[in-house]
Structures are given as C-alpha cells and as structure tokens.
C-alpha cells in the first residue's frame, strides 16, 4: 500500500539573509507561545523589543553560513527527505518547517487534496520539549481543525534513548573520535528553567535535586535536561569515552531569564583554562546542521575557545542526510504510534 504519507518536520529558516526576511522569521518563531511562554501582551512587547536589533545581528550570522543552495538547515533537510524516499515504502515523503516555508499547513493541505488520509508526523527532535515537539503537534492539530481535514496521524516520539538513533549517532561520530582529541563536549540547545519546572508532573524533581540520571519515568518523559544528559551518558558509554573526557553543556540562551546549565559559553572558557587544546564539540539536539551549530559553535565558539587559550575546536557534523541515519529514522517512523 502506498497511501500513507511521511511528513518530516524541522524548525525552519528565514527565506533569505535579508534583514526583512530574518525579522519575519524571528517574529513567527518568537511569538509562538510554546517558545516564549508568557501572556500574549508580555510576549508581544518582549518580541517587539528583541526585533529592534536582533534581525540585523542574525542576518549577519545567517549570511556567514549561508550556502549557494540556501539555508543549510533547509538544504540538509531536503537531502534527508530524498534519502528517506528510498526507505519509506508506504507513500510520499514530504518536508515541512514549523516556521517559514514550506509550512505544515501548506504541506498537509496538499496531501489532503491528493487524497492522503494517513500521515506519520515526524518532528525531527531527539529530546522532548514543548518548544519543539509539542508545537509541531499542536500546529498539525490547528491545521486539521481550520481546514476540516480528514486525516489520521501517527506521531514519531522523542527518540533520544532509542537504539536506532544512538546507533546512527555512534557511527556518524566514530571517525572523528578516532583522531586525537583532549575532550568531547556535547552541546545541547538550552531552554529556560521554567519550561522544565512547569512540565514536572510531580513538582518535586526538575532542577530541585540532581536527578537527571535517576529521574522516575513520569518525570523523564517530559524532562528535556534529563533526556539530554541520559542520551549523552549512553553515547559516551557506547563509545568507550572515559569519565572526565566528556561533558554536557547547553547553548543558545536568549534573554535574561535563567536557562538550564552549564552554559556552553562558560564551559568553553573552563575547558581552555583546564588545559584542553583540541576540543571536539557535537550538538545532539540537532539532526541537521544549522545556524546554532555552524555559526554559534563552529565560528563563534571556535574563536572564543582559541581566545581562552585552546588551540582547535572541531565541530562534529550532525546526522544530516547520512544514509545510515535515514535507515534508522525509517525504522523509528515505522513504529510511530497512532495519536491524532
């Protein structure tokens, strides 16, 4: 049967490096209540203030990593889409972005017009967060309601602990770890601490004690920090990396609110001060390279590390369109449960 579509969803990107396009993208992204979880008037005021200077700064950053084909995130996601077409045997493989184009609404509407009633929705985020997984699911729900679409959805669950994801990660990173290095830093995207507090169903664990490696299942299911740390520890164990030669940090802090720690910026300085000369950095919260990996870590992070006394920061590429990753992702999508 070929009546079951697969919809891969990633974060998105500005249409170009022009300031106006970056401003439009940032406005859509930051006004999402799952990203900045403040009341609408406060969120609107805060985003308006951010948009005074941030678009020009971000446009410069995007321009520094933009490819001839376009945004690296979009280009790499399209390449993964093509690789997945060789694996997914049940119907078409489509790609949408939560922010920017092609939008979830555009793609779901087209699939409905083509007669597809079964869709596997695949948010390409290994760990769970409201600002990634939940917002994709809720946007799909909104489109279905607004357009009165007759569709059934299976939804790919967070896969930070799944053998398929870990196997793909190990095989992708292995060649880099075969070269001499002093330390491996696993830098995950950060989140405001309040995002974790509000999702702790017990109200007793997240960020109140050091439970990330021992969190009960009900807490672990929605605790982003615990999922990051557990996946990092499992990866390090599978690679045989001794304790002390790897660590975890969190990047991309925005605003003055307290975010989960340790911060990547601080960790880079600490490692250089500890005598680390050749530092490997991988970013396992991302399955495709993007501005947060290429510019924030590969460019600015490398410069900061050298200024602090390090010699070389090597950015390990994300999974991107690796054929082995496509095979493993297909296995994950095959068993996605029916949810909507």
UniProtKB/Swiss-Prot annotation:
One Gene Ontology term, aspect cellular component: cytoplasm
Keyword Lyase: yes
Keywords: Cytoplasm, Heme biosynthesis, Iron, Lyase, Metal-binding, Porphyrin biosynthesis
Pathway per the UniProt entry: Porphyrin-containing compound metabolism; protoheme biosynthesis; protoheme from protoporphyrin-IX: step 1/1
GO function term, MF aspect, one: metal ion binding
Top-rank taxon, per record: Bacteria
A Pfam short name: Ferrochelatase
Record GO biological process: heme biosynthetic process
Catalytic activity: heme b + 2 H(+) = protoporphyrin IX + Fe(2+)
Documented EC number(s): 4.98.1.1
Residues the entry annotates as binding Fe cation: 189, 292
Subcellular location: Cytoplasm
SUPFAM superfamilies linked to this entry: Chelatase (SSF53800)
Predominant cellular place of this UniProt entry's protein: cytoplasm
Job of this protein: Catalyzes the ferrous insertion into protoporphyrin IX.
PANTHER family (alphabetical): FERROCHELATASE, FERROCHELATASE, MITOCHONDRIAL
Name used for this protein in its record: Ferrochelatase
Name of the gene encoding the protein in the UniProt record: hemH
């Amino acid at each position: 049967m070929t009546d079951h579509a697969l919809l891969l969803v990633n974060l998105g990107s500005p249409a170009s490096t022009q300031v106006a396009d970056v401003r439009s993208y940032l406005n859509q992204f930051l006004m999402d209540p799952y990203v900045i979880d403040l009341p609408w008037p406060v969120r609107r005021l805060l985003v308006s203030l951010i948009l005074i200077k941030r678009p020009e700064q971000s446009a410069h950053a995007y321009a520094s990593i933009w490819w001839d084909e376009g945004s690296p995130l979009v280009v790499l996601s399209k390449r993964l889409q093509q690789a997945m077409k060789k694996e997914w045997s049940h119907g078409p493989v489509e790609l949408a972005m939560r922010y920017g184009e092609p939008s979830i609404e555009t793609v779901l509407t087209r699939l409905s017009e083509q007669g597809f009633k079964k869709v596997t929705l695949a948010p390409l985020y290994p760990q769970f967060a409201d600002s990634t997984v939940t917002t994709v699911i809720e946007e799909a729900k909104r489109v279905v309601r607004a357009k009165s679409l007759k569709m059934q959805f299976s939804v790919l669950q967070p896969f930070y602990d799944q053998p398929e994801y870990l196997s793909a990660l190990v095989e992708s990173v292995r060649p880099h770890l075969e070269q001499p290095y002093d330390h491996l830093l696993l830098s995950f995207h950060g989140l405001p601490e309040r995002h974790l507090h509000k999702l702790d169903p017990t109200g007793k664990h997240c960020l109140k004690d050091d439970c990330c490696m021992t969190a009960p299942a009900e807490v672990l299911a929605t605790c982003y920090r615990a999922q990051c740390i557990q996946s990092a520890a499992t990866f390090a164990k599978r690679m045989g990396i001794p304790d002390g030669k790897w660590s975890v940090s969190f990047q991309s802090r925005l605003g003055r609110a307290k975010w989960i720690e340790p911060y990547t910026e601080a960790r880079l300085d600490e490692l250089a001060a500890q005598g680390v000369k050749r530092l490997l950095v991988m970013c396992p919260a991302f399955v495709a390279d993007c501005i947060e990996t290429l510019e924030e870590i590969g460019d600015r992070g490398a410069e900061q590390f050298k200024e602090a006394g390090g010699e070389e920061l090597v950015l390990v590429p994300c999974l991107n369109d690796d054929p082995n990753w496509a095979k493993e992702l297909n296995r994950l999508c095959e068993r996605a449960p029916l949810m909507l």
